[in-house]
Amino acid sequence: MLYTEKEKNEIERVRKVFAEHLQQSTNFELLWSDKVGFVWLAIGLNPLYVDTGRRIESAADLCHECLDDVAMDVLYMTGNDHAIEEADPLELAEIKRRWKPYIDQLPEHAYLCDELLSRRK
């Protein structure tokens, strides 16, 4: 079995909360494989390419990937070519603002925000 019923339901819940973001992202695709389960596939549209894929292990794993992608959207929007570790105070405020609607629906995963931000210098 790829996931227990409980694990799959938890992953599906996270997927539904992030559904619009998942649909609109040009950086990745979330796919289902009958062989390995959910796969996070890094992609690009300009130029068109498929990069790496990794198996989503849990709801927390999917939530972490989605939150990280939301943060990267903010950094791309500001035109700064750096990682979250170098985000300035305004970027951090915007990242936290964009995370809030998701975390309000998934409060059990709020600790992931702290984990992502703890990578900062």
PLM feature spans:
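Acidic, low-complexity, intrinsically disordered interaction modules
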Residues: 35-99, 103
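Short intrinsically disordered terminal tails
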Residues: 1-5, 97, 117-121
